[in-house]
Amino acid sequence: AAPVYTNPAMAGTGSCGGGGRVVLNYRNQWPSLPGTFITTAASYDQNFDKIGGGVSLLILDDRAGEGLLTSQSVSAGYSFQMPVNRRFTMRFGIEGQYGQRSIDWAKLRFEDQIDPSRGFVNATKEQWSSDQVGYVNFAAGVLGYSERFYFGLAAHNLTQPVQSFYGNPGAIIPRRYTAHGGLVIPLDGRKNPESTISPNVLFMMQQKFTQMNIGFYYNKGPLVTGLWFRQTFGEYGNSDALMALVGFRKDRFKFGYSFDLTVSDARAAAPTSHEISAG
């Protein structure tokens, strides 16, 4: 995923030589299931010394059930850069977001449409008030990093906006908390960025759902590979998936393909997911 999606404090951390960072993501979740679960994202971030930090823009589109339910959002963020010393820097980020959810009621099927002999042929008498709802949302985060390690904390959906098509005040987007960190270890014992291993962990919590991804990147020249394990905890806890990545990098450009292999009880119906990223 885009770094600024994980933590708004990461805005500006990808700048190199005064330039910015563009990241594009496409994810197809469980393509073997009926319907589609597709997420597309595009982000840009850049550091500006004149304003003491970085800015970011993130556009997200999520589609479920062959367009039955869609969500779009646009987020803009700023991270304040605070050098602690020559080797270690802190960043404090904030982000504002406008989001919109839409539902295509015509693709839903209701009980009163069923004819015992002919199936779904009748017109429904169900009434709905709206097919679209918009909301304003906010996030904040903190990041500490050096050349060889990083760690961060972030909180999303701070205002817990209502996302109900019927105005139900209880249908909120719950707060999401994220903790993440990692190391960059040169494999030849010297400061050689061409050959490194980077163990990392990401921990997310949202209401009763808790998830941890743990694994590593391996970089050798232009080659980038990685392997992670995803575990969920609590009421919905299980060993969820293995994730593998292969890609390459050239100067500032990176391209990667990742493959999720489900290892939980859902693997028979939803064995795989696929994601492509470039930036």
Short names for language-model regions:
Residues 1-279:
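Subset of outer-membrane beta-barrel
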